[in-house]
Swiss-Prot record:
Taxon lineage: Viruses, Riboviria, Pararnavirae, Artverviricota, Revtraviricetes
Keywords: AIDS, Host cell membrane, Host cytoplasm, Host membrane, Host-virus interaction, Membrane, Metal-binding, Phosphoprotein, RNA-binding, Ubl conjugation, Ubl conjugation pathway, Virion, Zinc
Protein name (database record): Virion infectivity factor
UniProt-annotated stretches for the region Interaction with host APOBEC3F: 14-17, 74-79
Span list, region Interaction with host APOBEC3F and APOBEC3G: 54-72
Length: 192
């Protein structure tokens, strides 16, 4: 019988970013209580030797599973040290992989207070309106003009520590163009 391969998307992430993300998840699960209902599975609870941890996030009758891996093949760069993250959406026996932006939007639908388009309607009906969005990573579009006007009136309050964003976890820090401070150039290069 032949080997049958399954391919899945795993974002290469450096281990310090994974470590920070895990500690943020644990903080909001056990200390702040904002991630109520989330389940953290340690590496020793998984039968798979490459799984470093799993975070199960209930989304109604479905769930989002964020799995971190270690001991993977290293990438083409020195800093690709064999760490990675995969994101799955599961409902009963069906599962599919999702990208980090969609994962953040799904988390935002079910968790964390938000000052969004519905705030305008709630304010008109006399309901209590949350003055800010706690989970900015869940927004990837510009709000309506009414929303932007209301948001301009209310100054956002920074949350310490920040909420665990899947997009932030998987972003590519290494291939971003470097920003340099000032105009430091060699005098011989520009002729002055």
């Amino acid at each position: 019988m032949e080997n049958r391969w399954q391919v899945m998307i795993v974002w290469q992430v450096d281990r310090m970013r994974i470590r920070t993300w895990k500690s943020l998840v644990k903080h909001h699960m056990y200390v702040s209580g904002k991630a109520r209902g989330w389940f953290y599975r340690h590496h020793y609870e998984s039968p798979h030797p490459r799984i470093s941890s799993e975070v199960h996030i209930p989304l109604g009758d479905a769930r989002l599973v964020i799995t971190t891996y270690w001991g993977l093949h290293t990438g083409e760069r020195d800093w690709h040290l064999g760490q990675g993250v995969s994101i799955k959406w599961r409902k009963k026996r069906y599962s599919t992989q999702v990208d980090p932006e969609l994962a953040d939007q799904l988390i935002h639908l079910y968790y964390f207070d938000c000052f969004s388009d519905s705030a305008i309607r709630k304010a008109l009906l006399g309901h209590i309106v949350s003055p800010r969005c706690e989970y900015q990573a869940g927004h990837n579009k510009v709000g309506s003009l009414q929303y932007l006007a209301l948001a301009a009136l209310i100054t956002p309050k920074k949350i310490k520590p920040p909420l665990p964003s899947v997009t932030k976890l998987t972003e590519d820090r290494w291939n971003k163009p470097q920003k340099t401070k000032g105009h430091r150039r060699s005098h011989t290069m520009n002729g002055h």
